[in-house]
């Protein structure tokens, strides 16, 4: 009986250890021991930076190019049917191989600087309906306006208060007013650039103000503001009497830049360029500042 109730030394030791771990106060230790027993800091639960970014950036790793690609796909997706209803036959039609006939087609291309065929048609029809201009006279009226721009420029301030020499009883200002309702006067004049170029050379009549613009005798036929459209396939389809020279291109380019500088009010203009040798003078101030006394 006494042997069954007695506890073995090992079990007594285990109970002693358990009581120390639960009820006994912590024993005093040195500062070094306390430092060693300090538990490690708990990891913070702050969200990483990527999770705080917008979904489109975080999902793509924050890359600018990937974000732009993602946004572009979203814009395109609105024009496409739902994924389960995509019809790839339209895509196949776009990817068909091009044939020789593809290169023979004519396309009505719209360029901002020059009149389109649709705009010119609208001008001619309005001339006929509003100003009673016979359709057979539309071409010669357009040429008359283009020649006027050749000599006086094609800005919105160009004066057209004169009678037409080609259409009896018509004031050119009314005809130009119709043009300005549909397109700019410069776009209209640009369409006839090759025509006025040929007309000037064949009749030996350069633009009236070529000297005032600083052109030389060698470059005088380029002294009109739509010169850059001479020979353009988008203009009136006639062959230029001759191809403009490099000096003529240079003269027109410098003169155009000078006009831009003046119109922007920078206070600086170039001197008349010496186009014969391809050089220009240094710019001089329009209103030089005088030293204060």
Swiss-Prot record:
Protein role: Required for genome encapsidation. Forms ribonucleoprotein complexes along with TGB1 helicase and viral RNA.
Cross-referenced Pfam families: Flexi_CP
Family to which this protein belongs: Belongs to the potexvirus capsid protein family.
Cellular component terms per the entry's GO annotation: helical viral capsid; ribonucleoprotein complex
Quaternary structure (record): Interacts with host NbANKr; this interaction targets the capsid protein to the host chloroplast.
Listed transmembrane segments: none
MF-aspect GO terms: structural molecule activity
Superkingdom of source: Viruses
Residue ranges, compositional bias (Basic and acidic residues): 1-14
Protein location: Virion; Host chloroplast envelope
Biased composition annotated in UniProt, kind: Low complexity: 18-37
Start and end residues of each stretch annotated as Disordered: 1-49
Sorted UniProt keywords: Capsid protein, Helical capsid protein, Host-virus interaction, Ribonucleoprotein, Virion
InterPro entries from the UniProt entry: Pltvir_coat
Protein name: Capsid protein
């Amino acid at each position: 009986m006494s042997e069954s109730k007695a506890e073995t030394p090992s079990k007594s030791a285990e109970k002693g250890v358990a009581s120390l771990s639960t009820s006994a106060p912590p024993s005093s230790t040195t500062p070094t021991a306390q430092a060693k027993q300090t538990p490690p800091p708990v990891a913070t639960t702050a969200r990483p930076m990527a999770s705080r970014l917008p979904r489109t950036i975080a999902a793509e790793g924050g890359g600018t190019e990937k974000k732009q690609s993602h946004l572009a796909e979203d814009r395109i997706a609105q024009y496409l049917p739902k994924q389960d209803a995509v019809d790839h036959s339209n895509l196949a039609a776009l990817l068909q191989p091009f044939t020789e006939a593809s290169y023979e087609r004519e396309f009505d291309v719209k360029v901002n600087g020059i009149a389109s065929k649709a705009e010119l048609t609208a001008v001619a029809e309005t001339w006929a309906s509003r100003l009673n201009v016979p359709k057979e006279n539309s071409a010669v009226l357009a040429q008359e306006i283009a020649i006027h721009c050749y000599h006086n420029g094609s800005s919105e301030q160009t004066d057209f208060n004169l009678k037409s020499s080609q259409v009896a009883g018509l004031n050119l200002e009314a005809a130009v007013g119709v043009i300005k309702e549909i397109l700019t006067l410069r776009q209209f004049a640009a369409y006839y650039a090759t025509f006025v170029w040929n007309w000037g050379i064949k009749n030996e009549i350069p633009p009236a103000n070529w000297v005032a613009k600083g052109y030389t005798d060698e470059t005088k036929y380029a002294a009109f503001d739509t010169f850059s459209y001479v020979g353009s396939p988008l203009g009136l389809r006639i062959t230029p009497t001759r191809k403009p020279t490099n000096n003529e291109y240079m003269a027109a380019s410098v003169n155009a830049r000078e006009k831009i500088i003046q119109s922007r009010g920078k206070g600086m203009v170039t001197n008349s360029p010496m186009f014969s040798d391809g050089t220009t003078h240094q710019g001089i101030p329009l209103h030089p500042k005088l030293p204060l006394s």
